[in-house]
């Protein structure tokens, strides 16, 4: 009899990454280590239906994420949403990733608190937990109250210990993260005003931004 294959634990962290910065990367690393993930995939959104249009081209955002995770164990890049010629709905991505995994493999969708509170506005949001667990990155300063639809969902699907989430999908749990006061909006504003963003983004990302003259104010 062949030995049973070990269950894989895969995470997905989506975002516009416009640009990717140390806040994204620190959260990704902390979740990966805390949850014992085999891999956490940073997944740049092409045309996110719930966000403003990214300021720079998809290929530049993808390249910056690749530069950011180069050589970082267990962090990787997934470009599938950039290959779609239509709005990038999370449910489509989860269905696609789930189809590539084994039936028992665990898939974790990592969301920030604000994104989680906005779930009822997402396309086919009620189906998300059919394909994954949801890990919510909780901040001490989070002040948004979840809508009633999510209160009901949390009552039914919440797991107090994220490391105890069992099965391939179906539960929600919270992971505390180290709050870093950095945002992509702040970085874009600094760059547009000609100021340095060193130490807010990895050196390789800064080098890419400078080489391609991204986020500069129009002349």
UniProtKB/Swiss-Prot annotation:
It comes from the Bacteria. Pfam families: CTP_transf_like. Pathway: Cofactor biosynthesis; NAD(+) biosynthesis; deamido-NAD(+) from nicotinate D-ribonucleotide: step 1/1. GO terms for molecular function: ATP binding; nicotinate-nucleotide adenylyltransferase activity. One of its GO terms (biological process) is NAD biosynthetic process. It catalyses: nicotinate beta-D-ribonucleotide + ATP + H(+) = deamido-NAD(+) + diphosphate. Coiled coil: none annotated. Its EC number is 2.7.7.18. InterPro entries: Cyt_trans-like (IPR004821), NadD/NMNAT (IPR005248), Rossmann-like_a/b/a_fold (IPR014729). Keywords: ATP-binding, NAD, Nucleotide-binding, Nucleotidyltransferase, Pyridine nucleotide biosynthesis, Transferase. The keyword Nuclease does not apply. PANTHER family: NICOTINATE-NUCLEOTIDE ADENYLYLTRANSFERASE-RELATED (PTHR39321), PHOSPHOPANTETHEINE ADENYLYLTRANSFERASE (PTHR39321:SF3). Belongs to the NadD family. NCBIfam families: cyt_tran_rel, nicotinate (nicotinamide) nucleotide adenylyltransferase, PRK00071.1-1, PRK00071.1-3. Catalyzes the reversible adenylation of nicotinate mononucleotide (NaMN) to nicotinic acid adenine dinucleotide (NaAD). This is Probable nicotinate-nucleotide adenylyltransferase. It comes from Pseudomonas putida (strain W619).
